[in-house]
Amino acid sequence: MEPVFLFLILAFPIASVYLLFYHKKRVVGLSAPPGPPGLPFIGNFHQLYKASSTHEYLWSLSKQYGSLVTLRMGSVPILVVSSPKMAKEVLQTQDLIYCSRPAMTGMQKLSYNGLDVAFSPYTDQWRHTRKFCTLELFTQKRAQLNFRPVREQEVSRMIARLSETAAASKDVNAYEWFSNLATCIISRVAFGKRYDEDGIGKERFQRMLSEIDAMFIGFFVSDFFPMFGWIDKLSGMRDRLDRTFKDLDMFYQELIDEHLKPNRLESPTEDLIDVMLKNEGSSLTKDSMKAILLNVFNGGTGTTATVLAWAMTALLRNQGVMKKAQEEIRSVIGKKGKVDEDDFPSLPYLRAVVKETMRLYPPAPVLVPRETMESSIIGEDKDHMYMVKPKTVVYISMWAIGRDPKTWKNPMEFVPERFLERPDINYKGQQFEYVPFGAGRRICAGINLGVTTVELALANLLYTFDWEPPAGMRFEDIDDETTNGLALQKKNALYIRPKKYMFP
């Protein structure tokens, strides 16, 4: 039985008893931000669970209650932030209070009890790990010497294979192609091995990525209702999590063992495992390395493929933008044959297309949850100040912020020109109307790797091919419906047909 349904069967009788005997005490002083009324014991659990789209539901709450909304999932208080001003308050002004992470069951287990950099609570260990990632793994020098050749080789390889598909007049599943590209780049960068389109290795790798996602978004009763934690065992979720962890740990260990072999052929460039093994010590154990690999795999593959799929969706739905982007790229590159990273400064419209894609279709519609470490006072103005308790989970809705008409003119339209008018807006978490990768202490450490891959791939896709919908389908038939989850996936797969562009 699904853990959610099993929990609900048991929870409602308890909620009824709770309602009979519970009398809310009067609280003196500042109150929590407003929000929809919940039920005793379960809070707003039933409302969130029945919502077909969590990010759409949170957006609707911001329209009704404002930029700060209070929810409760069982014993866990939740704060939803939906404006640039309040995002700045959380991500910058009071960052130290809001910079921890909730210790969610799935994330904690797969990150070796919080040894990673993305999901770990704010601890001394996290600070050491973050410093190592910033100063050793994702430096600008390493991006140029180690990452760039891999990116350019894998994008060229994808373009060559797509050219064969175009010659055969076949349709392609865009996300599958982009996912394969991202997987090949990340696997080569991380451990010097490509997991290709076919074969047992690729199947195993993709299966593990799928299980990681399932465990991250899966419902563990113990996260919200600790007294019912035993349901996780009864429902099978705990056993599934243990199996997933065991499989991942074995996979990581195999990779590390391969790198430790004395007769291993030396690669001309270091991969991330090489770098980590050279820095192994008290604050960087093998478990820490495995936890970092989790972040690289999970964050690097899905985000790149998702953004590329949404970029192509938006361009196909907006043919004028598509044509303008292609004209820019082809006029700059000419008959050189491909776009490389040195060409980026001459392609401002292309880069604006990527930014606009992540505004309208943010890779994470709700940023990875934060958790307050102490009480906080927050509000839009002095007449609307609220108290936020310690251990409150904080959701920052990029879906709502990117669609805010107070910030963006015609927010539902795909208009890359808005970023040409605001060249100061970047990915560094400095303008809080646009923070697709977060900001402050928790900003994504691998921004440059991900964004550069998207820009390089998209530029070459638009340079080399014209794009059409499948036979019998019109451009206006391409939808932008979304699924529910941590990442903003397309509900319906995007099938498109490449047609090789021939210069006159």
Swiss-Prot record:
GO terms for biological process: coumarin biosynthetic process. Pfam families: p450. The record marks A118, G299, T303 as: Substrate specificity. Heme binds at C444. Gene3D superfamilies: Cytochrome P450. GO terms for molecular function: heme binding; iron ion binding; monooxygenase activity; oxidoreductase activity, acting on paired donors, with incorporation or reduction of molecular oxygen. The keyword Cell membrane does not apply. GO terms for cellular component: endoplasmic reticulum; membrane. Its cofactor is heme. It comes from the Eukaryota. The chain crosses the membrane at residues 1-21. It is an enzyme of class 1 (oxidoreductase). It is a single-pass membrane protein. Its EC number is 1.14.14.-. Residues 363-368 are annotated as: Substrate specificity. Pathway: Secondary metabolite biosynthesis. It is found in: Microsome membrane. Keywords: Endoplasmic reticulum, Heme, Iron, Membrane, Metal-binding, Microsome, Monooxygenase, Oxidoreductase, Transmembrane, Transmembrane helix. Belongs to the cytochrome P450 family. PANTHER family: CYTOCHROME P450 83B1-LIKE, CYTOCHROME P450 FAMILY 71 PROTEIN. Involved in the biosynthesis of coumarins and furanocoumarins (FCs), natural products required for defense responses against attacks by predators with potential medical and agroindustrial usages such as anticoagulant, rodenticide and artificial vanilla substitutes. Able to catalyze the hydroxylation of esculetin to produce 6,7,8-trihydroxycoumarin. This is 6,7,8-trihydroxycoumarin synthase. It comes from Pastinaca sativa.
